[in-house]
């Protein structure tokens, strides 16, 4: 027998020491202790209900597991690499504490369905927590939008000045992204929140278990329908990693803008000192380390997605040891996403907006040129002709170092006799912004309406 191994009956030689270290997962899967114990308690209660094991053994098992939980949370539990993983560490300790009753716990289950349960329980809780962090970030964005409700800034395409927009409208763009992220997390929860326990190693179990009872005890709305798929499925983890990658992409895009906006060239915003660092050599520096690091961590999350996809891509049914590699990418992504969301929500809430700088930038770069074209269209000119006229007026302004509002009416009429003095009212920043009143536009009225809609939870 391989000494001290709960599976060692078939073996005549001990496990190689380095193999033992190489194959152990306890260093990282010990974070599943709470889920493992919770699942074992539910399994034990079901075994007792079904009279598969005696009720007195069930009570010993439950009491022993609760004591082990207390020991782990008090930092008094010594994890052993020789016991490989969290499941064997807990089961071995349980048997040492309560004797033969502890050895009955694993009746009717395998580590294959046990670990599938633990991961689903763990991810289920984390999905709820990540959704709550997304709510905090959305609240920070809405708060900034409300504080700066009428602040005008340049909108960009190709990072070139395009049209004036409200800063609040820009914040609401990220609100939409993070609301979609929350929706994806909620969808992922539906496919995560399914009980796999009862699948056994791969084919089910010969014992008369009651899977639906375990599902009820663990708050799962349904059970898996195929034992092979139950133990080999990691789609729910992959789906989360994909959703997390999109979420981090949104944070990375936002980070890029915050980094640009905080430069001395833009000066659109000031990030709080608490979210920046200095230079070891340049005394004047205030570096936006937080958004830079979030931007960098995005690649890490992408890598975790690719790592698990690559692990799973060639695995035959059912369980394979390769699948031990599912946990570190999952755990690392959860930690990264939660940390990034928390720090981002706090940073955005404390961010200061330089309103005059934004407005002055919006007034440059011919940002109201489209409004001139729209003005001519309303006067009866076809849009393509209007586009040509305004393009020529912009070229004239560039050559004469002027902006559109600085043109005299005589100069305007040189481009089209349709233009009259009312052109000046049409190309103010406020007029440009507020003319875009359709749903989803940047008008002040529309932005206020959108903030109210999101605040109402719609």
Curated annotation (Swiss-Prot):
Record-linked CDD domains: Argininosuccinate_lyase
Report the superkingdom from the record.
Bacteria
Q: Does the keyword Manganese apply?
A: no
Compartments reported by the entry? Cytoplasm
The GO molecular function terms of this record are:
argininosuccinate lyase activity
Q: In which pathway does it act?
A: Amino-acid biosynthesis; L-arginine biosynthesis; L-arginine from L-ornithine and carbamoyl phosphate: step 3/3
According to its UniProt entry, one GO biological process term is: arginine biosynthetic process via ornithine
Q: What is its EC number?
A: 4.3.2.1
Q: Which reaction does it catalyse?
A: 2-(N(omega)-L-arginino)succinate = fumarate + L-arginine
Kindly report, in one word, the top-level EC class recorded for this enzyme.
Answer: lyase
**Keyword Amino-acid biosynthesis included in the entry's annotation:** yes
Q: Which SUPFAM superfamilies does this one have?
A: L-aspartase-like (SSF48557)
Spell out the Pfam families in the cross-references.
Answer: ASL_C2 (PF14698), Lyase_1 (PF00206)
Q: Name one GO cellular component term.
A: cytosol
Keyword set, alphabetical order: Amino-acid biosynthesis, Arginine biosynthesis, Cytoplasm, Lyase
Residues annotated as coiled-coil are none
**InterPro entries annotated for this entry?**
Arg_succ_lyase_C, Argininosuccinate_lyase, Fumarase/histidase_N, Fumarate_lyase_CS, Fumarate_lyase_fam, Fumarate_lyase_N, L-Aspartase-like
Task: Identify its protein family.
Answer: Belongs to the lyase 1 family. Argininosuccinate lyase subfamily.
Q: Report what the protein is called.
A: Argininosuccinate lyase
Which species is this record about? Geotalea daltonii (strain DSM 22248 / JCM 15807 / FRC-32) (Geobacter daltonii)
The gene from which this protein is expressed is: argH
């Amino acid at each position: 027998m391989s000494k001290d191994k709960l599976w060692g009956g078939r073996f005549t030689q001990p496990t190689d020491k380095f193999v033992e270290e190489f194959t152990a997962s306890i260093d990282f899967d010990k974070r599943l202790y709470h889920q493992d114990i919770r699942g074992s308690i539910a399994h034990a209660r079901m075994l007792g209900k079904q009279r598969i094991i005696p009720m007195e053994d069930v009570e010993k098992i439950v009491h022993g597991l609760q004591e082990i939980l207390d020991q782990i949370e008090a930092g008094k539990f010594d994890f052993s690499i020789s016991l490989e993983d969290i499941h064997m560490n807990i089961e071995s300790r349980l048997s040492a504490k309560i004797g033969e009753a502890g050895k009955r716990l694993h009746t009717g289950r395998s580590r294959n369905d046990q670990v599938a349960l633990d991961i689903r329980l763990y991810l289920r809780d984390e999905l709820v927590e990540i959704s709550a962090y997304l709510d905090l970030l959305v609240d920070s964005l809405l708060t900034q939008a409300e504080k700066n409700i009428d602040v005008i800034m340049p909108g960009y395409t190709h990072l070139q000045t395009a049209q004036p927009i409200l800063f609040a409208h820009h914040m609401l763009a990220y609100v939409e992204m993070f609301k979609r992220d929350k929706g994806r997390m909620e969808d992922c929860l539906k496919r995560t929140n399914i009980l796999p326990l009862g699948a056994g190693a791969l084919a089910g179990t010969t014992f008369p278990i009651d899977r639906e009872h375990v599902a009820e005890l663990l708050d799962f709305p349904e059970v898996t329908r195929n034992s092979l798929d139950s133990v080999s499925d990691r789609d729910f983890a992959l789906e989360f990693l994909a959703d997390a990658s999109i979420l981090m992409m949104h944070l990375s895009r936002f980070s890029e803008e915050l980094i640009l906006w905080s430069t001395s060239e833009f000066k659109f915003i000031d990030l709080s000192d608490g979210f920046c660092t200095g230079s070891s050599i340049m005394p004047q520096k205030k570096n936006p380390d937080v958004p830079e690091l979030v931007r960098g961590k995005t690649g890490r999350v992408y890598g975790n997605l690719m790592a698990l996809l690559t692990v799973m891509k060639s695995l035959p049914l059912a369980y394979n040891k390769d699948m031990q590699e599912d946990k570190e990418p999952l755990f690392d992504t959860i930690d990264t996403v939660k940390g990034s969301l928390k720090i981002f929500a706090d940073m955005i809430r404390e961010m200061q907006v330089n309103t005059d700088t934004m407005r002055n930038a919006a007034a440059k770069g011919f940002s109201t040129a489209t409004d001139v074209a729209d003005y001519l269209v309303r006067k009866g000119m076809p849009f393509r002709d209007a586009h040509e006229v305004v393009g020529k007026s912009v070229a004239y302004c560039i050559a004469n170092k002027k902006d559109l509002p600085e043109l005299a009416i005589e100069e305007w009429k040189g481009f089209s006799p349709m233009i009259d003095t009312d052109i000046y009212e049409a190309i103010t920043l406020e007029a440009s912004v507020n003319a875009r009143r359709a749903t989803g536009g940047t008008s002040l009225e529309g932005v206020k309406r959108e903030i109210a809609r999101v605040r109402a939870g719609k």
